[in-house]
A protein has these predicted regions:
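Short, small-residue-biased leader/transition segments that mark boundaries at the very start
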Residues: 1-5
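His/Asp/Glu-rich metal-coordinating catalytic cores
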Residues: 11, 28, 41-174
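Divalent metal-coordination and catalytic microenvironments
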Residues: 19, 38, 82, 129, ...
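Histidine-anchored nucleotide/phosphate-binding helix
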Residues: 19-26
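A short helix->loop->beta-strand "cap" motif at the edges of active sites that frequently abuts
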Residues: 26-33
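Generic beta-sheet signal
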Residues: 33, 124-128, 245-247
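A conserved active-site cap/scaffold subdomain adjacent to cofactor or substrate pockets
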Residues: 161, 165-216
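Accessory, non-catalytic peripheral segments of nucleic-acid enzymes
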Residues: 203-336
Length: 336
C-alpha cells in the first residue's frame, strides 16, 4: 500500500535493487502481489512495466485515469476482487470527472468509490494510500494544517477489507478491517515506542475476516535512553542491554559533560542523538508547546498571527475574505 520509495532518498539504486529482488522472490513462489503508488512515489515510474508484470502475477496500479478495475482472484469460497487505488489528490479526480463536486480529499475519494462499487456477491479488498481521519500520526510523517487531506473511514464500508498505506504506525481505523500495516522499521525517534508488526489477513466466506499479527524485531532497535552520565557508563547498567541499538540518549546531569557524545559512543557505537534534560534546558523550554498543527485550521493560524501583530482580532468581514483566499490558494495548489 506504499510508499514504495521515500522521496528524500538521494540515491535510490539500492532501494530499486531491493524491490526488484523482493518482487522476484515472491513471483518465483507463485504468490500474487498487489502494489500501488503513494504520495512520495512517482506514479508513472511505479506503473512502468505494469502490463508485463501481470504475467508474473505482480499487479501494479496504473497512473490514475478513473475508477479502478477489480482484479479477480478465485478460491474455494468464490471470487475475491482486489481494487488498487493509488494516492489521490482532488485535482486528479476533477480532471477525470470535471462535473463532479470535488473540493476536498474526502470528496475525491467518495467520487472515485461511487464509480467503482464492489459487487456485493463477491468478497472485496481495497488497497489505498490516504490519511484517514482519527488515525495516529508521528513526526516521521507529513501532516497537513487543519487535517485538510483527511478522509472518512465510513467511505470504505462496502469493502470487506481495506489495506492502507501512508502512516508509519500499525493500527486499525474505524473498524478492525480497515488497517494501516505501518512500516517494517522505525524511521524516527517519535516511533521509538511503536511495536512494528506484520498483519496476516484471511478472508473466508463472504463476511468472515480473520486478522493476526506477528511482531517484527529488527537486528538493531531504535530506542530512547535516559539517565545521568555516571549511570549510563556504569557497566552494571549497560552490560545486559543491546548497546548496538540506534539510540537517542538524554542526559540528566545539571552540568554539561565535556565531549559526552564521543565518550558515550565508546559504549554505544550507534548513538544518533544526544540531549540534556536539566534546569537550564527546562527553562529554555518554558514557552507553551503549540497545539498539533492538524488540529488548527489555516484560518485559525492566520487569526492568531493577526491578533499578535495588531493587538486586535480579525473582523467578520476580514475573516470571510481570508477564508476565501485560503480556499483559492489551496485549490490552485491542488491544480498545479
Amino acid at each position: 500500500a506504499s510508499d514504495v520509495y521515500k522521496r528524500q532518498l538521494k540515491d535510490r539504486t539500492e532501494a530499486v535493487r531491493l524491490l526488484d529482488w523482493f518482487l522476484t522472490q515472491l513471483a518465483e513462489r507463485q504468490l500474487p502481489v498487489f502494489a500501488i503508488s503513494g504520495n512520495h512515489d512517482s506514479a508513472d515510474r511505479i506503473a512502468f512495466g505494469a502490463a508485463l508484470l501481470q504475467n508474473s502475477r505482480v499487479y501494479v496500479s496504473p497512473v490514475f485515469t478513473g475508477a479502478p478495475v477489480p482484479i479477480p482472484l478465485t478460491d474455494e469460497y468464490g471470487t475475491l476482487d482486489v481494487y488498487l487505488l493509488p494516492f489521490l489528490k482532488p485535482a486528479m479526480v476533477r480532471h477525470v470527472w470535471p462535473d463532479e463536486p470535488v473540493e476536498t480529499y474526502n470528496d475525491a475519494l467518495a467520487c472515485v468509490l461511487r464509480h467503482c462499487p464492489p459487487d456485493p456477491a463477491h468478497r472485496s479488498v481495497l488497497v489505498a494510500h490516504q490519511f484517514v481521519a482519527g488515525a495516529a500520526c508521528c513526526e516521521s510523517e507529513e501532516v497537513s494544517v487543519g487535517g485538510v487531506d483527511s478522509v472518512d473511514a465510513s467511505l470504505f464500508d462496502a469493502f470487506d477489507y481495506v489495506a492502507l498505506g501512508h502512516l508509519h504506525s500499525p493500527q486499525k481505523v474505524g473498524r478492525d478491517t480497515v488497517r494501516y500495516c505501518g512500516t517494517p522499521l522505525k524511521y524516527s525517534f517519535s516511533e521509538a515506542r511503536q511495536h512494528k508488526s506484520a498483519c496476516f489477513v484471511e478472508l473466508g466466506p463472504k463476511g468472515e475476516v480473520s486478522i493476526t499479527t506477528a511482531p517484527l524485531t529488527p537486528k538493531h532497535d531504535l530506542r530512547e535512553v535516559r539517565g545521568s552520565y555516571m549511570e549510563l557508563t556504569d557497566r552494571r547498567r549497560y552490560a545486559d542491554t543491546a548497546v548496538d541499538d540506534y539510540l537517542h540518549i538524554t542526559l540528566t546531569d545539571e552540568q554539561d559533560v565535556p565531549d559526552a557524545l564521543a565518550r558515550l559512543r565508546v559504549i554505544y557505537p550507534n548513538l544518533m542523538r544526544l540531549d540534556y534534560d536539566n534546569l537550564r534546558t527546562r527553562e529554555d523550554q518554558q514557552i507553551t508547546a503549540p497545539e498539533r498543527a492538524e488540529s488548527i485550521t489555516p484560518l485559525e493560524h492566520f487569526s492568531a498571527f493577526y491578533q499578535l501583530q495588531n493587538n486586535q482580532p480579525l473582523t467578520a468581514a476580514q475573516a470571510a475574505f481570508c477564508q476565501q483566499l485560503i480556499e483559492e490558494i489551496w485549490k490552485e495548489g491542488e491544480d498545479a
